[in-house]
Every structure is written in C-alpha cells, then in structure tokens.
Amino acid sequence: MKCQFCNAKIHKDAKVCPACGKRVNGEKIPKAFSQMKSAAIGVGCIAGLSALAVVLFIAMQTGWDLGSSFDWLKPRANDLYYKDSYTVSDWKAKYTRNDVVATMGDAQLTNGQLQVYYWMQVYEFVENYSDTAISLELDYTADLAKQIYTDGKTTWQQFFLESALEMWMTNQAFALQAQEVGYTLPAAYQSYLDNLDAELAKDAAKLGYASAEDMIRAEMGAGCSLADYTAYMQVYYTGYLYFTDLYGKINPTEQEISDYFDANVTSFAKSGVTKTSGNYVDVRHILLVPSADTETAWAECRSRVDTVLQKWQNSDMTELDFLVLVEQYSQDDITAYTGGMYTNIAKGDMEETFENWCFAENRQAGDWGLVQTSYGYHLLYFVEAEAIWHAEAKTALIQAQGRDLVDGVLAQYALDVDYRKIVLAEVEMG
C-alpha cells in the first residue's frame, strides 16, 4: 500500500509513514468533542444570580463546556477538539500571530508559523487528492470547520490542523537533533534558503503582488508573515533532509531480513507473499512511440529505433550509457527522468512481450533487448531480479526501523500544544 500523504510505498501494517512521518491507515488519537456554547454575561437584577455569573465568566475564560444545567459545567480538554472552529477574523489572526501555541524542547511554534503548516497541508491535499476530495464531498472553498471528516467526528479543519501539528512535530524534532549533532545542509539547499527572500520577491512580482509579504498573507492567511514562511522552510528542510540522511543509512543484513520474514510469515501470507511467490525485476527502458497506429507510422518508428540501437551498440553498453540514451530519446514521460527505470515488476504487470522478456529463464544483469508492445518499441536493459518475499520483507523491515527512528527522536523532546491559543485565518480558495 501507499501513504495517503506522500505516496511512499509502505507496509500494510504500518502506523507511521517512514518517509513523511505522518500517521497512516486512518489511525488517529482517540477523540470525543462536544459543542462549544457561548453566553452573554450581564449584571443580574437578582442578587442570587451574581455567583452564577462569576462561574459562567470563569468557565468562558478557561474553556469550560457551557449548557443549560450544572451538569454541563465540565472542563473541556486541551486537545484537538477544544474548539469547534479555529477560524478567526483577520484582525485577531494578526494580533495573535506571535502567540506560542506549541513547544518542543527549546523550539517554539507560533500561530503565524502554524498557519504555514496548516495551509500547506490543505494545498497538498487539494493538489494530490482532488478526486478523493470529490468522492468525499469535501468542498475546500467552503468552511472546513463545518464539514465532517470520514471518521464522522472530526471536522476537516481539525484533520488538517492535526496533520499540520504532526508535520511540525516530526520536522522540528529532527531539526533539533540535527542542530545538536552539527548536521549541515547540503550546499545547494543552504544556498536556496539563503536566497529565499529574493526568490519569493521575484515570484510575488510575477504573480502580481506588491511584495513577498503580500503574497504570503494571501496564500497563508492574514496572521502569517514572510518571516513565518522562511522559518517554516528552514525547519522543514533541516528536519526532512536530516531524516532522509539517517533513513538512507538503514541497511538490514540478510539474516535480519530472513528473520523478519519468518517472524511475520503469517502476515505476509495474508498479503499473498510466500517464499514461492517468484521474483520482482527491475528494468530500464527507452520507449519510442509511433505517431499513429498505421503501418507507415510504425515503420517510421522502427527507423528511429534503429538509430538508437546503433548508438547503443557503438557505446560501451554500460548502464550509464543506457541512461544517457534514455534522457535523449525516451518518449515515456513517466520514467524519462528516472533513467527509464521500472522497479518491482511482477508477472502480470506488463504486456506479454515486455513481460516475457523480463522473466525469461537465465536473464542476467546487463542483458538488453528490443520488444514491441501496443505503446511502441521498447529498448530494454535488465538491472536485477529479487525474490518477492525478500523484497517485501526488506521493505517492511526498513520501514519498521524507520518508525523506530522517528519514535526514538520524538521521544527525546517534550511536546506541549496549547489548543486554547490556536487560531487560523481564512484564505480564499477557488
């Protein structure tokens, strides 16, 4: 299965995506929220009401749930459901932008910075899951605080807020540890951050904004500033790149992979993975497509194939040489910028001629060939084969160790979120 947030491949039992650090499979912190009531408190004409007025006033200030009887005077928990709606006026968003709403170790998150995390979650969802939004009847142009998420309890605003806080929590924890161990960003990323203000100013001008500040306020809400956005980018890149550096070093041994599979053999079997499931193969390809489905067009396409074949055979015929030709000639938009790579191909994934070549007996790394499918001609380069059970166990084990990595880093820093102080400004979406 894949993470619904970053699309990374994850094990079906995963609770946290090792790539982005978010909770998956719909797992959420247990929640139970009730409706916030408002009350207008005035001076009572009957002296006996004054004590009740004081109680109600204190309740309003401290987050007590108000109702029509004393049974409703219960403290509302400082959690995601503290407010039915976190939306406030632009004036209040600006006034409270520097209020600290969360801390982790020595790091602080302000309302202004939270705006960035929140709206980035919304924009990412709209961009990547627009079809899902339609099927869920989510109208992102309407008030998200009045639309219920799929669990039947949480509002979409609360869902995105929780996602935003989890994103900050994960990135900030790794950014803190990166600072402690003296990790430095790769030069290209540091240069990007150093020049971010200037680049944002250019982007703002292109989009018709008077300044980068105006652009940020329009995109992230009235309570957000350019400084808030650049702070977000610094934490995001530092935390994410440090995490990916550590994650990339996870390299379980063959014995660990075998032991992990054996320990979870029942779970893998439920997914149809056994030690007799066959192989995955990785191949690179160069696709040349005919201009039309006619005999003349196919002949012209074959002529272009011969040109590429000649260049291939005149090279040293290494994988690097193949990569060069992929970049120059491949018409497969999906793989052209990844070296023409298809990974984890299983039987049944491709058209018959393509598949027969990939799974031919005694196929070896470095083998190459030419096949024709309904898409066109494919010049193929065989990279490797791996037993499906081994590949799935290795992936699952790396993800498990990645979750342990995330949990271990998060455990080092005390987290405190004050939902009572959180406010969100509106952004016009259409």
Q: Language-model features: where?
A:
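Second-shell loop/turn segments in exported
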Residues: 99-105, 149-165, 174-185, 228, ...
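Charged, solvent-exposed helices and adjacent loops that form client-binding or oligomerization surfaces
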Residues: 123-163, 167, 179-276, 299
